[in-house]
Regions:
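Glycine-rich, basic loop-to-helix element that forms the pyrophosphate-binding segment
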Residues: 63-79
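Short, well-formed alpha-helical segments that are part of the catalytic scaffolds
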Residues: 16-30
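Conserved nucleotide-sugar donor-binding catalytic segment
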Residues: 77, 138-216
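Short aromatic/hydrophobic "clamp" motif used to bind/position activated sugar donors
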Residues: 84
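Acidic helix N-cap motif at the loop->helix transition within catalytic regions
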Residues: 19-22, 46-54, 92, 96
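A conserved acidic beta->alpha catalytic loop
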Residues: 27, 42-51, 88
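Flexible acidic/His/Gly-enriched loops in nucleotide-sugar-dependent glycosyltransferase catalytic domains
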Residues: 68-71, 98-104, 108-166
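C-terminal subregions of glycosyltransferases and related glycan-biosynthesis enzymes
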Residues: 148-150, 156, 177, 204-339
Length: 339
């Protein structure tokens, strides 16, 4: 089958993941789909990744280290497939994943997203899927949700298949090193989003994730996330298809940005951080999540805004570090015995 007849390209991007990349590649080859091609891009790894990749026999390229976004663009240039899945080298597809995904790859679809099971560095399951399947059922108008909150329910990078024109937006995202920004955020404005509630892949959580999942809470990282989000929203507003229903996104009124401002204020010990609560609570109450979730989110943000700074920081860690999401960890955070 020639490159022009493939319906989907899976681009595996790798940097120093010698211990995982063979499993990632093997999980794609095991799908046994003639209408899918596999392309591996090694982003100048300094470990044994390239040797491992070559042994698999797949079509692979080794380039000078330039970051995930550049590696994925390089891979995109090697295929003409109309849909692309960027698979991180530490993640995997589960058996039958592409059989479930490919029938949905239609011209009007901008993105197909699916759930990922969370595993640790050793492959042990960590509990519930991401996102939770129930959240996929509460979609509503995703464009309006992005305008109001700055986000929508979406899996990490490896849980998405993008139409090619969305991937082309990466070329102008020189403010970003990753690929899970503009193309995820812009997808609802470019076509339909198909959400599959099945667990079709594995997402590895460890301290080397590009997303930062599994790391501690750090003020500089929060600031970086806020600046990245600001750049991403500006990019979205530039490329958003213009019609009467698609107004620009105002970053300063979105849930994502307001929440990060409050979290940053709590982490650095900013006096008067509670003054940020009204705007944030207004966005939470207007969201489409069920009342119980609104109550939990509202309670969390009220607590981190009024508790002593040390307790507030502990509570933030409980929420944002998966390994700390236990009843005991929450009790320790609230009583100041988290350390």
């Amino acid at each position: 089958m020639t490159s022009s007849t493939f319906r989907l390209a899976v681009i595996v991007n790798c940097y120093n993941y010698a211990e995982y990349v063979e499993r990632a590649i093997g999980s794609v080859l095991a799908q046994r789909r003639d209408d899918c091609e596999v392309i591996v891009v090694d982003d100048g790894s300094t470990d044994a990744s390239w040797e491992v990749i070559r042994q698999t026999g797949v079509r692979a390229f080794r380039i000078e280290n330039g970051g995930q976004r550049r590696a994925c663009i390089y891979g995109l240039d090697q295929t003409t497939a109309p849909f692309v899945l960027f698979l991180d080298a530490d993640d995997e597809l589960l058996p039958g994943a592409l059989d479930a995904i490919i029938p949905h790859l239609q011209p009007e679809v901008a993105k197909v997203q699916f759930c990922l099971g969370r595993v640790d560095g050793g492959g042990q399951h960590l509990g519930s899927m991401v996102p939770h399947p129930e959240l996929f059922c509460r979609v509503g108008d995703l464009r309006e949700r992005v305008r109001r909150t700055g986000v929508y329910v979406s899996p990490p990078t490896s849980g998405n298949v993008f139409r090619r024109d969305l991937c082309e937006l990466l070329r102008d995202a020189d403010y970003d090193n990753a690929v899970d920004g503009i193309i995820i955020l812009a997808a609802p404005f470019f076509g339909e989003i198909v959400s599959l509630p099945e667990e079709l892949g594995l997402y590895r959580v460890h301290d080397r994730n590009l997303s930062g999942v599994g790391r501690g809470i750090d003020a500089d990282i929060i600031r970086q996330h806020m600046q990245r989000f600001r750049n991403c929203i500006a990019h979205l507003n530039r490329v958003m298809p213009r019609d009467s229903k698609q107004q620009p996104v105002d970053i300063d009124t979105t849930y994502f940005y307001l929440e990060k401002k409050l979290i940053l204020a709590s982490v650095v010990g900013q006096v008067g951080r509670y003054r940020q609560l009204p705007k944030l609570l207004n966005v939470i109450i207007g969201d489409y999540f069920p009342p119980a979730r609104k109550l939990i989110l509202s309670g969390f943000h009220i607590l981190i805004a009024i508790l002593p700074f040390s307790l507030s920081r502990h509570l933030i860690e409980v929420r944002y570090r998966p390994e700390k999401r236990t009843g005991a960890a929450l009790a320790r955070a609230l009583t100041g015995t988290n350390r």
